[in-house]
């Protein structure tokens, strides 16, 4: 088992080598717009997963993920050779290319947040003109329980302003 720090360094180096090779050395039209975003190497340094995204031909154009995946599969051997020469490790890791869905997740979250903001704005507009149903104060003041009296009972103030003391004797059985 290799050190996790060594695996991270190797993954970073693989990311750099593969991105540079795709941009400057491999002339495949299917790799136009492919960007290497990350790489992960297993603890034994034998397998590397390289994550990529694909840009569309225009800002509004849909990227061709199938063509990019096919082009990366065609270039896998050349890229592994370049990784082996560039890293200097005893065993060159096998490369697996996986589409990075982080940007898709970000776009989806942005859409959900925009919908939530719009729903909040609609609710705020409705709330401005809303009036309570029924009376202005639907809760009647039937009396409130205040502090205990000196006799040990509770003083109850009614809405008429009268005070009554509840000593708790109502619930005791008489002898």
Swiss-Prot record:
One of its GO terms (molecular function) is ribosomal small subunit binding. GO terms for biological process: maturation of SSU-rRNA. It comes from the Bacteria. The keyword Cytoplasm applies. Residues 131-175 are annotated as: Disordered. Residues 162-175 have a biased composition (Acidic residues). The keyword Cytoplasm applies. Keywords: Cytoplasm, Ribosome biogenesis. InterPro entries: KH_dom-like_a/b (IPR015946), RbfA (IPR000238), RbfA_dom_sf (IPR023799), Ribosome-bd_factorA_CS (IPR020053). It is found in: Cytoplasm. Monomer. Binds 30S ribosomal subunits, but not 50S ribosomal subunits or 70S ribosomes. Belongs to the RbfA family. This is Ribosome-binding factor A.
């Amino acid at each position: 088992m290799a050190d996790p720090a060594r695996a991270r360094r190797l993954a970073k180096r693989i990311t750099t080598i593969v991105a540079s090779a795709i941009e400057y050395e491999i002339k495949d039209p299917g790799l136009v717009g492919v960007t290497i975003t990350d790489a992960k190497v297993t603890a034994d340094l034998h397998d590397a997963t390289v994550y990529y995204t694909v840009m569309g031909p225009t800002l509004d154009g849909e990227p061709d993920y199938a063509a990019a995946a096919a082009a990366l599969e065609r270039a896998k051997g050349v890229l592994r050779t370049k990784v082996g020469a560039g890293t200097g490790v005893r065993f060159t890791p096998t490369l697996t290319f996986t589409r990075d869905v982080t940007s898709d997740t970000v776009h989806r979250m942005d859409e959900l947040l925009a919908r939530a903001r719009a729903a909040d704005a609609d609710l705020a507009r409705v709330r401005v003109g809303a009036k309570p149903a029924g009376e202005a104060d639907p809760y009647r003041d039937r009396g409130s329980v205040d502090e205990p009296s000196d006799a040990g009972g509770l003083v109850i103030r009614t809405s008429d302003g009268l005070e009554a003391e509840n000593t708790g004797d109502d619930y005791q059985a008489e002898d």
